Amino acid sequence: MAIIPGVEQKPMSSNLESRIDQGTGREPADMVLKGGRFFDLVTGELVASDIAICGDTVVGTCGDYKGRHEIDISGKIVVPGFIDTHLHIESSLVTPHEFDRCVLPYGVTTAICDPHEIANVLGAEGLQFFLDSAMETIMDIRVQLSSCVPATHLETSGADLPIEKLLPFRNHPKVIGLAEFMNFPGVIHKDPVCMAKLEAFQGQHIDGHAPLLSGAALNGYLAAGIRTEHECTSAAEALEKIRKGMHILVREGSVSKDLHALMPIITERLSPYLALCTDDRNPLDIAEQGHLDYMIRTAIASGVEPLAIYRAASISAAKAFGLRDRGLVAPGWRADLVVIDTLQNCKASMVLSGGRLVDDALFATRKPVAPVGLDSVKARPVLASHFGVPVTEGETPVMGVLPGKIITEHRRYKLPTDGNQTTVDLENDIIKVAVIERHGKNGNHANGFVQGFGLKKGAIASTVGHDSHNICVVGVSEDDMALAANRLGDIKGGFVVVEDGRVTGEIALPVAGLMSLEPYETVRDTLHTLRKAAYALGTTLEEPFLQVAFLPLPVIPHLKISDMGMVDVDRFALI
């Protein structure tokens, strides 16, 4: 080693020396992908080249390399691993270990998750479970600390996460700052609780959540240091936020589907300020369509330039979250690589995660993490009479479901009555909805009406109810609603479908009432059966279960329901 005068010398790591030697070709590389091309996301070129890998790092391109392990990928294209920049793993209905096994083969090598679903149920215990899991997965799972638990004062959650409970996690190696700051009114109006969290995380990444926020109010929100946004549902909204310095995370989940609406902004010019995310996506949709690869295929088929969408899937995403070691196929960059047939079809035939070939043998090396929250459903039993809605004067507020959106409209109808009770109006597709507190805190029970499910009979119930995850049930029959809600207690959480007094479909989600203990293949198959049971009730929604799950979310406009009652989100108040 050369001695540089005046500079303290430290021993070089053998890994660093190996990377240099293998990159220069003085030593055979640990692994070489031979005969293919890689997609250069800087120049937009497809470059014919070997790709040399040392450990977890690409060390050589644009050359002819020898390797201890050589893989022929002739005719294939290599792209950087995909980064899902905002998701709730709980919405996949499987544990982080099963999510890893389910999604990594599709080329998603990094996932930036907000575990605020389990955090709303279990608090710090839920965060710790995710961090412990992230240390064991093959995929690089990064965790943002849930910023709004509970999301609002308008619902009952199972736990809270004040700043004092977040600070011990702040410097964990898997933590990337503060998760989506949903309480944007609290930011704008300088709520002391919000201010304490924002102050504590200045200089770290703070994720945004500000649907439809615009003008001076948006300026104030961004002045707090918030930089990313996944709630844009129109190109105009996204452009305003890009102009004001935000990175837009284009979302395509199982319910929230914004990809087509945002395609006008997915251009080479704007791609440095774009990334991709799924937010909430279940195993059935992943199996049938894919994950981020589905978004890439769909965008290109609709006319988006490949360079723009592949940048958004990797290098631009990495830069948005300060992950400086990944996102390109280039020397010195992390060997998160996806081998595909064509840019257009984006079908992964091989995936490398940190230089490791992804296969069953690799997944078998992971250490298991014990599940938590196996007794979290503590709701009181309910009767059909608990779902009655007394007659009131004038029109009744009704949530209007928009297919493919989690935004619900605030509609008002003069509903039919039966004696002193307001009843469903099937002619106008209006049925009952209820939220039942399930954390054992107060036994709250609120009833209302929702339009747009298409149900003609029966009931659907869920313990997945964003964000506090109380029981949410929709239905035509009060008897079926009661049976569905009570069955959730028997199976320790999940989804239940009831038709004419009998359970026709269910899935148990005993981990905090949110996730299954079964392999994702079993969950996928069970969801397929559940969908059939829901469709038999007449629902016209492609994904009725996650649609139910978003009805209680009082941070998304315009009308929602919590265990405390109907919520006018625009006024941020109970009706």
UniProtKB/Swiss-Prot annotation:
Top-level taxon in the UniProt lineage: Bacteria
Statement: the UniProt record of this protein carries the keyword Hydrolase: yes
Catalytic EC class: hydrolase
Keywords tagged on the record: Hydrolase, Manganese
Cofactor: Mn(2+)
Enzyme Commission identifier(s): 3.5.4.2
MF terms (GO), sorted A to Z: adenine deaminase activity
GO biological process: adenine catabolic process
Pfam families registered for this protein in UniProt: Adenine_deam_C, Amidohydro_1
Catalysed reaction equations from the record: adenine + H2O + H(+) = hypoxanthine + NH4(+)
HAMAP family assigned to the protein according to its UniProt record, in alphabetical order: Adenine_deamin
Similarity section: Belongs to the metallo-dependent hydrolases superfamily. Adenine deaminase family.
Protein name: Adenine deaminase 1
Gene symbol of the encoding locus: ade1
